[in-house]
Regions:
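Extended, charged catalytic domains and RNA/DNA-binding interfaces, predominantly
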Residues: 1-229
C-alpha cells in the first residue's frame, strides 16, 4: 500500500510490542504479486472487490475456494509465476529487515504454510531467526504434507546455516487434530517435528484451542467464532 502508516493504523497498543512477524500465505505470493502488477485483470478485480467488501460472501465465494483448492493459480505461465512468487518473497524479506530495530523492536522474516486438506487447517506459521532464509517460501503446493514441509525446512534452512526456523501450528482448533497426528511417522520425522515445532498457537482472533464447543463447561471468553474442537 502507498498509504502512510498514520492513515492505515487507527489504534495503538498502550504498551508497544517487542517483536512482530507478517505471516502471509506463501501459496498466493505469485497471484497477489501478479494482481499488484496488473490489477485490471478481471480475476484480480474480483479479488480486490471481495477484499474491499470484507464480507462473509466474499470470503466464502472467492477466498475460501482459492485457499482449499490446492492448486497454484497465478494467471500467468509457470516460469512467470515462479518469478512473481520469488519477487514477493524477497519484498517480504526486505520489509522485515527494513523495520528491524535491534535491541528495541524485532521484526522476523516469516510466512505461512497453508495446507488445508478436506477444508481443515493444518497451517503453520514459519518464523525465521534472520534474513538467511530459503530462496523460495515453503508452501503447500511444493510441500503438500507436514512431512515434506519439515523435510524442506531441514534441507533448505537448517542445513544451510545460519538459517534457523520454528514452525508454529496455527488455528489448529479447526484442524480436528490433524496438526498433531503422529501415526506412521518414523523416528526421523518425529525428530524433525520435535526440532521445528517447539510451541503451538493457543489463542487468536478466529478461535481458541483451549475451547471445546458443546462441552459441559461454559467460558464467556470462548464465545466467538468457535466452530470445531
Amino acid at each position: 500500500s502507498s498509504s502512510a502508516a498514520s492513515d492505515v493504523y487507527k489504534r495503538q497498543l498502550q504498551r508497544p510490542l517487542d517483536f512482530a512477524a507478517v505471516t502471509d500465505h506463501a501459496e498466493y505470493f505469485g497471484l497477489i504479486n501478479v494482481c499488484r502488477s496488473d490489477p485490471q485483470r478481471p480475476y484480480c478485480q474480483e479479488l480486490a472487490e471481495a477484499a474491499a467488501e470484507k464480507s462473509r460472501r466474499g470470503f466464502v465465494e472467492i477466498f475460501l475456494p482459492l485457499i482449499v483448492s490446492g492448486e497454484r493459480n497465478c494467471l500467468v505461465d509457470a516460469a512467470s509465476c515462479s518469478d512473481s512468487e520469488a519477487n514477493l518473497w524477497q519484498r517480504s524479506i526486505d520489509a522485515a529487515e527494513a523495520a528491524n530495530q535491534p535491541g528495541k523492536f524485532t521484526t522476523f522474516v516469516a510466512s505461512e504454510w497453508t495446507a488445508s486438506p478436506d477444508n481443515l487447517h493444518w497451517h503453520r506459521n514459519l518464523i525465521y531467526a534472520n534474513a538467511n532464509v530459503p530462496k523460495r517460501a515453503i508452501n503447500s503446493f511444493d510441500q503438500p504434507t507436514q512431512e515434506t514441509m519439515w523435510q524442506a525446512l531441514q534441507e533448505q534452512c537448517q542445513d544451510q546455516p545460519p538459517c534457523d526456523v520454528v514452525a508454529i501450528p496455527h488455528n489448529s482448533n479447526i484442524g480436528l487434530g490433524g496438526s498433531f497426528n503422529t501415526d506412521g511417522h518414523s523416528e526421523k520425522l518425529l525428530g524433525l517435528r520435535a526440532q521445528f515445532e517447539r510451541l503451538v498457537e493457543i489463542h487468536q482472533h478466529k478461535g481458541s484451542s483451549e475451547c471445546y464447543p458443546g462441552s459441559l463447561y461454559s467460558d464467556e471468553a470462548c464465545n466467538f467464532e468457535i466452530a470445531l474442537p
